[in-house]
């Protein structure tokens, strides 16, 4: 059994390789070592001592740069309050290592792999370093299969790939976290395997809500914690940038163990990948690097690649990753979301315009894309229906300027029919969520792919032209829409 390299090396290297702090700039420390005793890049350093008030200090740092003159620059994983120049720093001789395996299930960890849920220590028989290379080309698996989510707009227009990377792109307050919670609800509960959730730089309240929700739904089993199906890793908004920059790697390391050693199919949820980039930008600026476009770090593409390339499917097992991506000022050309786009197999773009109309999930059907929407993967019927829906919505979008200036009456009969069907499609793409039941008062709905295709085919064919458009709003399958239309008719 592998020992924890962190503990093992510290015990033997205390006197052998110690340095002292020469400079502190916020979360970044410069540390001087003896000549020829410099730690490697990504090595973990530990600062121990007492602050002026006499309280014990134990801060873990990670080496980022070798500066010359026997000095290194490191970034702290926790607050640097109370640190002073001259304090002793110990080189552990190894990268940061975190617990992996079944012991992580049902627990909440921080970036260092320490439990933060007040349920006692974790018996970490096996640990793993958070920095690794991506699997070799020969190990990768290229099978293509659809991952059904039960959400109509996703399954029809931008289907997810099993073992793929999915990005949920959206500005502030358009519903990224609610959508990721619904996906956890629909997929993680039905999916027999394990899930890992990485909370990267998001609200602590949301992390707490998710934990409570998982306990209620028995995804985390409080009576018998070993029967839980999920491990949670949090580095929230109040943490220093070093922790937010590395917490995604901690979650990924736990997921990789389930894939490579236990040979399982794993779900990895990350909320929010933009905060990983943002933390890297803070660290980069504090380290004295020249900023690149829009003030981001010059190493943006490299940092994103080192995380994303490890999230993949091998012949041993798969990691299906669903990542929320904050879009600053709703600008998809911003370097952070633009870099993430390149790594995604499917992109679900959330629109502020749809959210303002009250259509939830506010997924933009024309901006969202998927590499899986090919007739030879999803089948001719699915492909033709999806293309029909997109063409109808695109024509409606083109006609909106004419409608705004001249009104509906000036349109041709054919265009008026297109507009009526497009408005029904737009409303039928909305759906009540299980996780939003408390707010909407409507019970959540899971709609199978077969039901979804059938419903949109009926709208496109004109079978439902006589039904009012409000009958299609916030319903599950098409039978519910026809039942709602009958109810509306009786009421009127």
Curated annotation (Swiss-Prot):
Function: Produces ATP from ADP in the presence of a proton gradient across the membrane. The catalytic sites are hosted primarily by the beta subunits.
InterPro entries: AAA+_ATPase, ATP-synt_VA_C, ATP_synth_F1_bsu, ATPase_a/bsu_AS, ATPase_alpha/beta_chains, ATPase_F1/V1/A1_a/bsu_N, ATPase_F1/V1/A1_a/bsu_N_sf, ATPase_F1/V1/A1_a/bsu_nucl-bd
Localization terms from the record: Plastid, Chloroplast thylakoid membrane
Top EC class, one word: translocase
Enzyme Commission numbers on file: 7.1.2.2
Binding site for ATP: 170-177
Topology term for the membrane: Peripheral membrane protein
Origin superkingdom: Eukaryota
Reactions catalysed, as given in the entry: ATP + H2O + 4 H(+)(in) = ADP + phosphate + 5 H(+)(out)
SUBUNIT field: F-type ATPases have 2 components, CF(1) - the catalytic core - and CF(0) - the membrane proton channel. CF(1) has five subunits: alpha(3), beta(3), gamma(1), delta(1), epsilon(1). CF(0) has four main subunits: a(1), b(1), b'(1) and c(9-12).
SS bonds (residue pairs): none
Protein name, entry field: ATP synthase subunit beta, chloroplastic
Organism: Angiopteris lygodiifolia (Turnip fern)
Gene for this chain: atpB
GO biological process, one term: proton motive force-driven mitochondrial ATP synthesis
UniProt KW keywords: ATP synthesis, ATP-binding, CF(1), Chloroplast, Hydrogen ion transport, Ion transport, Membrane, Nucleotide-binding, Plastid, Thylakoid, Translocase, Transport
Molecular function GO labels: ATP binding; ATP hydrolysis activity; proton-transporting ATP synthase activity, rotational mechanism
Family designation: Belongs to the ATPase alpha/beta chains family.
